[in-house]
Amino acid sequence: MGALGDSAYGARGRLIKFSYIVTALISILFSISCICYGIWLLARRSQYAELVSPSLYVDVGRILVIISILSILNYLICFYAIFKEMRCFVTSCAVASIVIAVMLIIGGCIGLNFRDQLTHYTPLNLKMLTSLRELYGTHDMKGITESWDALQSNFKCCGVNGTDNAQIWKTSKWYMHQRAPKLLIPESCCIPSEIERCRSNPFDQDAPPPYYTSTCYEPLQNDLLHVMNVASWLCITNAIVQIIPSVAGCWYSKLIRK
């Protein structure tokens, strides 16, 4: 009875096996949520990467997706190994879970570091101002042009911040290199229902502005800070969730007699 109690078939072994399965399933569900959020981040926020370079937040999104997929595959292999009582594979999968947890923690730290850099050190407003004036609309910087158009359309904003509002477009190379009749602001600044008036005379003082009057710096910064906060803590929490089944897996592998 003592030998049986210390084996995978005893009460302790069955409890550890059950604990592993439950915690692994919880971890899989959490990994699926990480994958969904990472895909959303890459699909809906990666278009602004050209304005924020280095775009570490995109890397965090990739880490969320790729490492979470590896985590799920690892659990599936471990499920098979546990039910077949393949001791070596169970141990390997448990160790792999720890490695995956470390990679997720690294991803979370990258995200938190990005937030700190964006808040205190990265002159995002100056980067945006430079890209608007010098790079928007140039043939070899289509990524910048697309990023600005997506930003202004999606956030319903125009210009950078403060005095560098919609009027700043008249100082840009995009404006200077146009042929007459010139557009004063890009169409991405225009309210869709006012597109014609926005093209012809957007700065008419006798009518409400046909363009977005909010500037883009603060909305973009606040959005990226929020998105990265969620992504970073998803990474770290997923890493913590990985630890419990990895410990249970290592313990269970010691009870397998094969």
UniProtKB/Swiss-Prot annotation:
Q: What GO CC terms are in its UniProt record?
A: oxidoreductase complex; plasma membrane
Q: What happens when the gene is disrupted?
A: Embryonic lethal. Mutants display dumpy and blistered cuticle phenotypes. Blisters contain unidentified cellular material. Resistant to iodide toxicity. RNAi-mediated knockdown results in the lethality of more than 95% of progeny at the larval stage. Most larval arrest occurs at the L4 larval stage and is characterized by body swelling and abnormal epidermal morphology, which includes blistering of the cuticle. The few animals that develop into adults have a distended body shape and/or epidermal blistering.
Report quaternary structure and partners.
Answer: Interacts with doxa-1 and bli-3.
Q: Which GO terms describe its biological process?
A: collagen and cuticulin-based cuticle development; cuticle development involved in collagen and cuticulin-based cuticle molting cycle; skin epidermis development
In Swiss-Prot or TrEMBL terms, this protein is called: Tetraspanin-15
Which consequence is recorded for altering G111R? In mac499; resistance to iodide toxicity
List the ranges whose topology is Cytoplasmic. Answer: 1-20, 84-93, 245-258
Family as reported in the entry's similarity comment: Belongs to the tetraspanin (TM4SF) family.
Q: Which InterPro entries match?
A: Tetraspanin/Peripherin (IPR018499), Tetraspanin_EC2_sf (IPR008952)
UniProt source species: Caenorhabditis elegans
Q: Does the keyword Cytoplasm apply?
A: no
Q: Which Gene3D superfamilies match?
A: Tetraspanin (1.10.1450.10)
Keyword annotations of the record: Membrane, Transmembrane, Transmembrane helix
Q: What does this protein do?
A: Plays a role in cuticle biogenesis. In complex with doxa-1 and the dual oxidase bli-3, promotes the generation of reactive oxygen species (ROS) and tyrosine cross-linking of collagen, thus stabilizing cuticular extracellular matrix.
> Where, subcellularly, is it found?
Membrane
Q: Please describe, based on the UniProt annotation, the reported consequence of changing G249R.
A: In mac33; blistered cuticle phenotype with blisters containing cellular material. Resistant to iodide toxicity
Question: Where are the membrane-spanning stretches?
Answer: 21-41, 63-83, 94-114, 224-244
Kindly give the PANTHER family that the UniProt entry links to this protein.
LD03691P, TETRASPANIN
Membrane topology qualifier? Multi-pass membrane protein
Give a yes or no for keyword Kinase in this entry: no
